[in-house]
Amino acid sequence: MTDHPAAIWHLLIAATGVNVTLARHLGLSVSDFSALDHVAQAQESGSPVGPTELAQHLGMTSASATVLVDRLQTAGHLQRRPRADDRRRVHLEVTDTTREQIQTHLAPVVNEVHRLTESLTSAERETVLNYLERICVALRSMSSAAAP
């Protein structure tokens, strides 16, 4: 059996591999996919981001983020929407087509994870989910500390 740090490392490497494969599937570079993924996560959480927030997250200038957003919009992956609270500003959204492509591509992995999760007892599931959430908190903390 693998020790815990190695198992977590293997999980991170596997997740990175999924992102690389998904980026290729969408015809994107890994860095462009990273931007798209951030927009999707922000959108899912109900806190959509604009180009300025995306630039801050990626550690790039606003001008570079605008070029990136333009590229993703031209490719049909992102759209700009006026913000309800300030129509002079925009937030970014992943297009429905791209969202469907991502969901279709990830469906086999999601189904397998669901199958594995269902094979656990309720207590095991709770323990694993709690542990994974704590790992996520630690990883987010590390990435927040490293942010410019």
Question: Would you name each region that the model predicts?
Answer:
Residues D70-E126:
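Charged, amphipathic alpha-helical coiled-coil/dimerization segments
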Residues M1-L28, A75:
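N-terminal leader segment of winged-helix/HTH proteins
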Residues N19-M60:
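N-terminal helix-turn-helix DNA-binding core of bacterial DNA-binding proteins
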Residues H4, L11-A14, V109, L116, ...:
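Amphipathic alpha-helices that form helix-helix packing interfaces
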Residues E124-P148:
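C-terminal regulatory/oligomerization modules of transcriptional regulators
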Residues M60-S62, D70:
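Membrane-embedded alpha-helical bundles of multi-pass transporters/translocases
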